[in-house]
Each structure stands twice: as structure tokens, then as C-alpha cells.
Amino acid sequence: KKYYSMRKILLITLAAMTIYACNNNGSGVKKGSREAGSIFYKEYDTPFGAPPFDEISEEDYRPAFAKGIEEQNKEIDSITNNPEAPTFENTIVALDFSGSILDRVSNVFFGLEGAEKTDTIEKISIDITPVLSEHSDNIYLNSKLFDRIKTLHDDTTGLNLTTEQYRLLDKYYKNFVRSGIMLNDAEKQRLREINKELSSLT
């Protein structure tokens, strides 16, 4: 998941979101009565699971990004520190389901950034993009995590994977390789520096 380049705000449910935004009756939690960012901390309780745009303010994004990164780091640590041998469920599925908070806030923020960029949104984008780039590097250059993926990818005998499951495993394996996991430590550090520089230019 390359969050800092995300621009795909729920295209499949765009019509549903539009209807909801237009017809919402104002019920639900108001912006001032909850912790900033908490709107993104769980699944949306809205028709079609659409983001409740009328309840989201610019003050929600920074804490939600911070919380999302923190929670995904915990989820990744749980995978890499699992004493059990890697399985499709405890490694690939767990990885695929990680970062739900970050997914929600990224989808909304980067989608709205392109549609209605305010000075505040622009400042948040400038600040958060390098942070998300570093977070992505921390995942895709995580040797312990890749070792578990590689173990599964190198020998799928006995895994009894469906075609869809194998494609997901193969996708993650290739994403890690393309992101530089095979580089030596010095090369990885240089890659991090390049990615940081590039993220500061976007």
C-alpha cells in the first residue's frame, strides 16, 4: 500500500456518497463533540459505508494519520513477532487487513485534496506525504516481514491456495521486491533518502 500516492477515493461508491451527502439529515456525532480524528477510527456507520463528509473537518486529518500509522505499526509487529510458522492467514491475510484506519483517512484526504484544496489541506499534504513515504518504506523494507512472505512464496506446496489467494501472495512478494527489499543495507538507506526527497517534491 503506497499511501502517499493514493488518489482512488472509493470510485465504486461515488454515486452512493453523493446521494448520502446531499440527503443526510444531520443526525449523528457532531464535529465538536468527539475526539479529533476519531471519525476514521472505525467503520463508517452510514448508508453504503460512505464517508460522512458532513462530520469530517480539517482538524481530523493529522491525528487520524498519526493514529493510522501507529495502529498499522502494531499490526505489522504482531505479524513479524508471531512465533508460529508463517501461513497464508497469519501473514498475507493479516498484512492485507492491516492499516484500515490509514486506508480510510488516506482515501478521504487525498480524494478531497484534488477536489477542494484549501491552504490547510495543502499544508497537511506537504507535511504528511514524507511521513507516509517513510511509513511505506518501513513496511516494504521490513526484512522480517518479507522473510515470512518469501517462505510462503518459495514453496506453496501444501498451502492449498486458491487462484485468488496465490495472486495475492504473489502480488505482495513482487511489491516488496520492486520496493527494494533485495537491496543491501547501504542501498536501502539510499533508497529511503531518494523516496524522502521525491515525496517532498510532490
What feature does the model see in each segment?
Residues 22-202:
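Zn2+-dependent metallopeptidase catalytic domains
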